[in-house]
Amino acid sequence: VIGAGFGRTGTLSLKEALEKIGYGPCHHMKEVFINADQTEYFYLASMGEKVDWDEVFKDYNSAVDWPAAAYYKELSDKYPDAKVILGMRDANSWYDSASTTIYLMSQNFPKWIRFILPRADKLFKMIDKTVFGEPFSYRFEDRESAIQVFNDHVEEVKRVIPEEKLLMHSAKDGWEPLCAFLDVPVPEEPYPWVNDSKVFA
């Protein structure tokens, strides 16, 4: 399963959901922060280097969130049988959340740490190339521009991925459409609802 949704579209909830229904471990940006190999893989990819996706995802059965979502087209071509899930959220709500959490963190990270820790420098160079810098033309703080990029991404995914391979899913949709799409039983427990905004406060 390939997640094509931007960060802050319920990706952490989707990660937990996929892991509960047999698609774990699920790759997420958290992996890139804690795993040096993952940092290196996605840094190289962001610099235009060819990476071995089989090696990158050898320990995972699904991937959601940035940075993997930035390569959804390449991954869909590499794994033609994989299904694609596009995390959905109201664009204004998404911007409000992203701009006060993950974007703020990426901008406020102490620059001196990047000078003394090479992995941290690579991590934030990757974020610049893959997440908030180039994809948003370095205008993420321009709300209207960022929301346009968000909406354009949604339309691109709908255009690129065949309808039968794509699920547009919001956390509020719960288990039913997700499980029907993946042809797995619906768990009895509630759909995961992970609101990690407080981590960035």
Regions flagged by a language model, labelled:
Residues 1-58:
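PAPS-dependent sulfotransferase catalytic core
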Residues 31-40, 85-95, 112, 152-201:
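The conserved 3'-phosphoadenosine-5'-phosphosulfate
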Residues 52, 56-77, 81-84:
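Hydrophobic/aromatic-rich structural module bridging two neighboring secondary-structure elements via a short loop
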Residues 19, 23-24, 31, 47-57, 70, 73-168, ...:
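PAPS-dependent sulfotransferase catalytic domain
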Residues 1-2, 59-62, 82-83, 163-167:
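Short active-site oxyanion
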Residues 3-5, 29-30, 64-68, 88-89, ...:
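Short His-Asn-centered micro-motif
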